[in-house]
Swiss-Prot record:
One of the Pfam families matching this protein, by short name: DinB_2
Note on how the cofactor is bound: Binds 1 zinc ion per subunit.
UniProt EC number: 3.-.-.-
Swiss-Prot/TrEMBL keywords: Cytoplasm, Hydrolase, Metal-binding, Zinc
Protein name: Putative metal-dependent hydrolase BCA_2790
Gene3D superfamilies, per database record: dinb family like domain (1.20.120.450)
GO cellular component terms, A-Z: cytoplasm
Taxonomy of the source species: Bacteria, Bacillati, Bacillota, Bacilli, Bacillales
Family membership: Belongs to the metal hydrolase YfiT family.
Subunit structure: Homodimer.
Domain of life assignment: Bacteria
Annotated binding of Zn(2+), by residue: 65, 156, 160
Function noted in UniProt: Possible metal-dependent hydrolase.
Amino acid sequence: MNDLRYPIGQFTYKRPITEEMIDTWIQEIEDLPNELTKAIKDLDQKQLDTPYRVGGWTVRQVVHHVVDSHMNSYIRFKLALTEKNPTIKPYKEEKWAELPDSKLPVDVSLVMLESLHKRWVNLLYSLELEDLEKTFNHPETGETKLAAAIGLYAWHGRHHTAHITSLRKRLNW
């Protein structure tokens, strides 16, 4: 049986990272707002409040989490581009998912995601090759190059979209 936590598998990538890989990943980041919107299309409130797996987040929490995560990533990119290997601040995503704003209508986060991704994609397309080598330091996972972070967040968007689409498929929604 597939691991419901990782419907598209865990994040991996081939080395070295090529310009073609970067372009594909940026396109996936650019496409995410539309893909996530399609994934939740026509879901009612009960469906939005259904966990994608036992013990997992609800569809609503997943949508809000994607925005929380990608806002943090956008800031991490800006820090890495303006400071030398900055140490970023991790956050407790499971606790953020329990805050009151995670119960808001999903449209609130979809609008934020659309705007955020327009800015982020603009920034990503402006990067030079040397910018892709810049890094940030995560206190728990260590140093990350921006090139790899682009891939990670492209995967992250597809990963959470697949949580929703696989739930829909399993429950025939």
